Amino acid sequence: MAFEFIFEFLHGCHIFYLTRVPSPAIIAQAFTDVKPKIIISVPLIIEKIIRKKVFPKIQNNRMRILLNMPYVSKKVNRKICEQVTNAFGNNFYEIIIGGAAFNQEVESFLKKIDFPYTVGYGSTECAPIICYSDYKTFVPGSCGRAVVHMEVKIDSPDPENIP
């Protein structure tokens, strides 16, 4: 709650909560209506929106051919990113994803189209956010770097090769 409410409240942000049980359609409509600047979400919400609204449009033979053509694929990916951005309200800086593991297929897709997302890590028991990186410096498959004034220790016999 500290990261999702208090931080934004102290900085003068408007905070919107859904008044209905969320579904991909309700959430997508809320993004269109509210046009948020920052989106903080669990992976499942982002994955459902991508799988239901985006993947069906790009998983046909024509799109597969276009996405495998070197020069054309860049333009197609740019257009796909634009459409995905529109699906999230077209007004945000980045989407911060956390609370569970992020599906690798969806993460690879978002990275491929150069979508502004990042994955953070927090632990409700000790801190609202422990690791975070801006989407411009985020490394896919990671959960960012330790935030300022946070010390992180990996308690493992082999901290360099954690599975």
Named regions from a protein language model:
Residues M1-R78, E82:
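Conserved AMP-binding/adenylation subdomain of ANL enzymes
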Residues I39, V76-P163:
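Conserved AMP-binding/adenylate-forming
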